[in-house]
Amino acid sequence: MLTERQLLILQTIIDDFIGSAQPVGSRTLAKKDEITFSSATIRNEMADLEELGFIEKTHSSSGRVPSEKGYRFYVDHLLAPQNLPNDEIVQIKDLFAERIFEAEKIAQQSAQILSELTNYTAIVLGPKLSTNKLKNVQIVPLDRQTAVAIIVTDTGHVQSKTITVPESVDLSDLEKMVNILNEKLSGVPMSELHNKIFKEIVTVLRGYVHNYDSAIKILDGTFQVPLSEKIYFGGKANMLSQPEFHDIQKVRSLLTMIDNEAEFYDILRHKQVGIQVKIGRENSSTAMEDCSLISATYSIGEEQVGTIAILGPTRMQYSRVISLLQLFTRQITDGLKK
């Protein structure tokens, strides 16, 4: 069990190192207003913290840096919530106030903004639709040649896309088709829609719409939606701006992993509910042993539908990132309900 003095010194070392990326020595600590102990006391406590495995020496400096054990203790026991600047809160809320109907756009823009706000790499795993059930479908004409097809699921997820309307299909045919779809398909799992449409619905449509072949083309375009999760990245190259990763050889395997994307898909799709923090070698990939990955799940109602994560150095601004993720997951959840 650490003493109050050791807790204060450990927290100050980690806070300072996160901000400066420079090893922290006793002289640096002695200049801090919150540290009122003598230099000798500070050195003794630092020696004890090193012996306990919370901090460690570097080859190029007499100062100390946090170890993985130190970061883990910091995250679990010392971290305090950080209040985000009001302008950032407004920026994030304004994004979701735009009523973005497409889950894909919500995920893409979330990844981009998070990467800009943190200068780390942001990763968003979009919602998986295959287990959702169709609630209703709408086809809203924009002009004579185009319309917006809107699919709403039982979880409140909204998927929209622009489709082409052949000249041979009139508005009355569109209306009949939508009525038939909603009558026959409401409550059907999304993964079964394609099979049900082309085995059952097409036969029904033949007796109601004038231009059957063109109506089938509209159907095919309307229900071509991705059922598996899609992964979106923001700031893939942001790691290169971190002092820890200026050595390109050191970061090569990480950049390859980020560029490949598939491994992150496997990592994120099995995340537990809530905020999860993986530090250094706690991560499953050796390419991430100098990184921390903070992830949070977002949901619609009781159902977890996606994951949003930030990848950065172990010297990460943990409190700020966690606060951002908490705000984003709330906003994404609300955005997908619109």
From Swiss-Prot:
Q: Does this UniProt record's set of keywords contain Repressor?
A: yes
* Keywords attached to this entry: Repressor, Stress response, Transcription, Transcription regulation
| Any one biological process term the GO annotation gives | negative regulation of DNA-templated transcription
Q: Report the GO molecular function annotations.
A: DNA binding
Query: What's the family?
Result: Belongs to the HrcA family.
Record function comment: Negative regulator of class I heat shock genes (grpE-dnaK-dnaJ and groELS operons). Prevents heat-shock induction of these operons.
This protein is called Heat-inducible transcription repressor HrcA
Q: Which organism is it from?
A: Bacillus cereus (strain ATCC 10987 / NRS 248)
